[in-house]
Amino acid sequence: MKLDVFAGQEISELSMIEVARAILEERGRDNDMYFSDLVNEIQNYLGKSDADIRYALPFFYTDLNTDGSFIPLGENKWGLRSWYAIDEIDEEIITLEDEEDGAPKRKKKRVNAFMDGDEDAIDYSADDPEDEDFVRESSDIEYDEEDPDDEKSEVESYDSELNEIIPEDDFEEVDLNEEDEEDEEEEE
């Protein structure tokens, strides 16, 4: 691939975001690109190794999102913001969504750029609990409404335990009024 914009410049000094902008400008408005295709084109143009691209990928994606000249078009497709008037951006995205409603969706195979064909590696996205539908399991424990008989039996058992510790015969009856009178005398 040859980009005329960079004629006379050292390819190794170009940033991935500059190359992405040039690639999208050369392809034109009707040729928006998937993110993975865009990264592959950049890698081919810059001649970078897979390891270099893997290292730079998170930074490039962040730059792509924060740079005001790029716009996500849905389904991980990207285009240039200059291709769309402000009012047209929402219409274009809605139109893409409307067109898809008629055709059945095929699931695309997920490609993990960091797996690198290593069979021993653990793919953590395969067991993501958010991907599964939530099903509430019924519990075996049933809660009854309060039963007054249960409360009485609890009180009786509590009283019997207290009687075992301190028999009822040992309790002294205290007149509450006597205590109040004693407190008043002490205060004087």
Swiss-Prot record:
The entry sums up its family as follows: Belongs to the RpoE family.
What InterPro entries would the database entry show? Asxl_HARE-HTH, RNAP_delta_N_dom_sf, RpoE
GO molecular function terms noted in the UniProt entry: DNA-directed RNA polymerase activity
Q: Name one GO biological process term.
A: regulation of DNA-templated transcription
Instruction: Say which species the protein is native to.
Output: Streptococcus equi subsp. equi (strain 4047)
Q: What is the lineage of its organism?
A: Bacteria, Bacillati, Bacillota, Bacilli, Lactobacillales
One cellular component term (GO) for this entry is: DNA-directed RNA polymerase complex
Task: Specify whether Transmembrane is a keyword of the entry.
Answer: no
Matching entries from Pfam families are given as: HARE-HTH (PF05066)
- Quote the function comment for this protein: Participates in both the initiation and recycling phases of transcription. In the presence of the delta subunit, RNAP displays an increased specificity of transcription, a decreased affinity for nucleic acids, and an increased efficiency of RNA synthesis because of enhanced recycling.
Which protein is depicted? Probable DNA-directed RNA polymerase subunit delta
Subunit architecture? RNAP is composed of a core of 2 alpha, a beta and a beta' subunits. The core is associated with a delta subunit and one of several sigma factors.
Which HAMAP family does the entry mention?
Answer: RNApol_bact_RpoE
Keyword annotations for this protein, in alphabetical order, are: DNA-directed RNA polymerase, Nucleotidyltransferase, Transcription, Transferase
